[in-house]
Amino acid sequence: MLEALGLAELAVLGFASYQDVKTREIDVWVIALLFPPALAAAYLSWSAPLYIMSPILGLVLALAMRLTGSGYADSLAIAALSLFPPFSPALPTPAVVVLGAGISVLGTSIWLLLINNRRPCRMTLTQKFTHICVTREEALKRSHRYIIGEVRDVEKYKPPERIEGDYVVARYGVPYVAHMALGFALYLALYGLVGPP
């Protein structure tokens, strides 16, 4: 039963990921659909050893993500995923999801470095891993993908209407829900191999 709930959750995450990659906006109803399978998994797992550690860690992570400027969808997704039981008391579910997402984000960072090394913008080494050099036209056409300037909260970001110069250095708006979907797929694979505690 937990495997079926996990696959249902992954299907919803897949659709949310599609929306996140395409527009960087996820419909509220899609995020709401993450909770029925997660709550059912929580109900079935409540008595598992140290189960409560996963939801607690998930809520702490969700709060930390929101306080550091991540979008509401990212925070709510990690909160929902944390309701799934850990396959090991030593590895709460959100830790596995974040680890898997981190591997995916590392791949994105390497991709950004390779792209930026061939583009004309002057960037620090750190920026080459976290930002992207794009043409003015691309930045204006797909403003949902690129964050220009200092932004503390992505929910309140308003793209500029004009950009000076032919190229601009922008923070790449990482679709973190898509990375979490890959992290949750890793969790499901490990859960299938190891099984419940």
Residue ranges and their predicted role:
Residues 1-197:
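A membrane-topology feature that recognizes alpha-helical transmembrane segments
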